[in-house]
Amino acid sequence: FGRFFTGQMTAAGKVPPAKVLVIGAGVAGLSAIGAARGLGAVVRAFDTRPAVREQVSSMGAEFLEVKLEEDGSGEGGYAREMSPAFIAAEMALFEAQAREVDIIITTALIPGKPAPLLITEKTVDLMRPGSVIVDLAAEAGGNCALTQPGAVINHKGVTIIGYVDMPSRLAPTASALYGNNLVHLLADMGGAKSWHIDEGDEVVRGALILLNGTLM
């Protein structure tokens, strides 16, 4: 992105802050909101789960909605597939936002399925030259129709980033956070002294694949 994130007032004129749209307000989306806000951007966010509105607002971002009530909350904090009417409404919202924002960051994933298509080629064409799309769902096929997994491309002046190795690009930090999660998981399971598998624990149950030879 070839401009300031934060707005600037200079003797030569005023530079407005960058406008960022984050699609999907899960862990990655909320992190993206925090990073963009920290750099001084104006941030908007969309998620099919109304429950995350408060989290988005608490981080200083505007929570966008469509005029169609439908809850996209799925299991494990992920979103579920939405109805055709809702998808059409959100597509119209993204097209309207594409005309205004400078950066779109997509993070939408559905467990066990390809990433939902949210940004069409038409939507990309509505963005100004110099704009950027960061597709964090590229490894699962991508939320943008033009994403090429593992590559960075330029489409009519719009840069589309489809990296599939984001954790590897920040290996020390990613490893430290992953290790920290494992330590807490094993401690919650009793540690070395009182190790046990509690099938009633939602976190443990979600991590189980086989138990006593039975596929969970």
Label each PLM-derived region with a short phrase.
Residues 1-8, 138, 144-216:
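Adenosine-phosphate binding glycine-rich loop
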Residues 4-97:
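Glycine-rich phosphate/diphosphate-binding loop of Rossmann-like nucleotide-binding domains
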Residues 19-21, 41-44, 62, 102-104, ...:
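Structural motif
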Residues 37-39, 59-61, 120-126, 149-152, ...:
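Short, solvent-exposed amphipathic alpha-helical segments in soluble enzyme
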Residues 51-54, 71-72, 139-143, 167-168:
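Short gly/pro/ser/thr-enriched loop/turn and capping motifs at secondary-structure boundaries
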Residues 73-122, 163:
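A structured beta-alpha segment of the ubiquitous adenosine-cofactor-binding alpha/beta core
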Residues 103-163:
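ADP-ribose/adenylate-binding Rossmann-like module
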